[in-house]
Swiss-Prot record:
This is 33 kDa chaperonin. NCBIfam families: PRK00114.1. It comes from Escherichia fergusonii (strain ATCC 35469 / DSM 13698 / CCUG 18766 / IAM 14443 / JCM 21226 / LMG 7866 / NBRC 102419 / NCTC 12128 / CDC 0568-73). Keywords: Chaperone, Cytoplasm, Disulfide bond, Redox-active center, Stress response, Zinc. It comes from the Bacteria.
Amino acid sequence: MPQHDQLHRYLFENFAVRGELVTVSETLQQILENHDYPQPVKNVLAELLVATSLLTATLKFDGDITVQLQGDGPMSLAVINGNNKQQMRGVARVQGEIPENADLKTLVGNGYVVITITPSEGERYQGVVGLEGDTLAACLEDYFMRSEQLPTRLFIRTGDVDGKPAAGGMLLQIMPAQNAQQDDFDHLATLTETIKTEELLTLPANEVLWRLYHEEEVTVYDPQDVEFKCTCSRERCADALKTLPDEEVDSILAEEGEIDMHCDYCGNHYLFNAMDIAEIRNNASPADPQVH
């Protein structure tokens, strides 16, 4: 049966290595449900969701993280936004035909991975790594080696559970400022690599960890729920309308009678008529409710 959308952190007591395990189903379904993506695009978004959750858990502060793929291929953009509360949303931009068996490089073309970290307090950081690996996991491992000089392995699996899309992943990372041995890390990575997709997506986390590491001493911390959460709102749309020239807004109102602002992440529509626009220009909050 599918597992709850949760992230589990764990630590190897005899090695200076930390780990994470995440499984997502409901969150993934909510990201996909308002779009008719080809299957290869769904798979990439599933992998991005898992990767973003795992990367977010490595942050030691409150803030947001965005992991995006950009390129000149038929999938020009795929992005997941997350935060330290494990609240996620995501979207992809697709143009042209996509083969059923398209791999990552076919989808993205000449491209790169962009990781943007925005602390609630402090400066924003952005890292860019070329799409040189064959998989998203390989690209992100390269990112960690370049940006943090920390040996890191990611193991990402996608599939279906009870006919619904699901995904899971694991992360292993040598802890900074620790005297970890590369041989120990490679040993743990070899064990982790044996995880089967069905096991990761359907078994409780503790059972997965026992199957992989039953000969090791592992401390598992309390899990953290992962959920879909969109940050769009009528107020944000109103703020965006304030930035447009009055002539442009008035022209749309004259042609359409109202302005329909659509959120690509969650599918919500926000409608603004002439009275709403007048209130916005007077710095008043529009009263009309959002329309789904």
